[in-house]
Amino acid sequence: MFYIIGVGPAPGFITEKAAQILREADCVFYEDYTGPIDVETLRRYARSPPTRLTRRDLEDESGRRVLECLSRGKTAVLATAGDPMLATSHAALISIARSRGYSVEVVPGVSIVCAAFSASCLSIYKLGGVATVTYPRGGVYSARPYELVEQNLARGLHTLLLLDVREDGVFMPPRDAAEIMLKLEEREKRGVFDKGRPVVVVPKLGWGGRPAYLPLGELLGSDLEGPAVFIVPGGLSPVERECIEALSVLKSR
């Protein structure tokens, strides 16, 4: 049996079902490139020492070590931060395991999407989509975040922006994301990411961070650290505005 479990965005978010699976699994693996994971929690529950797998292990080598465990008739678990299949990072491994006759179960966890909207007090019913602010690839910045925010602003919808992870495993800090967004504005020139654009930043959710509501330009000198997510509001209702300003450590002027 192969389980993929989500342990939530930070310590204390693991579900009882995920904890029980860790207690019973023969092989426990985890990855920390899609999000920060609390390894101490894994060690506390797992009966065997957790093994870290890199992106290369899971993608380039198609989860070879997981499949080797399964081939010995043992139960394997792969733990991820947040909700394991909110993105499709591990869909290929599920397909491979099933094609070889292994049973697979996905155990959901608290996702960064739900947690960010809960922490920021914004309505998830107004979420118009999710994009990722990425570092340039080959010197080119992806326009996807710009285009999605532009579409959602026209419809009065919120946009959730995830932030990239560097090749060395360092999570993009909000100041880098703000710089990239402003560079996209310099290129596109349609008034989507100007310095005065109000954004909600949710840094280190569950690790002591609190949401910040402020103009995009003020993040250039920010010391907020990653991992973090941005929400670009598509227009705040009076209730949303009052709530986010009450919860936020910083407020737009």
Swiss-Prot record:
InterPro entries: 4pyrrol_Mease, 4pyrrol_Methylase_sf, 4pyrrole_Mease_sub1, 4pyrrole_Mease_sub2, Dphthn_synthase. Coiled coil: none annotated. Signal peptide: none annotated. It holds the Pfam family TP_methylase. It is an enzyme of class 2 (transferase). It catalyses: 2-[(3S)-amino-3-carboxypropyl]-L-histidyl-[translation elongation factor 2] + 3 S-adenosyl-L-methionine = diphthine-[translation elongation factor 2] + 3 S-adenosyl-L-homocysteine + 3 H(+). Belongs to the diphthine synthase family. This is Diphthine synthase. It comes from Pyrobaculum neutrophilum (strain DSM 2338 / JCM 9278 / NBRC 100436 / V24Sta). The gene is dphB.
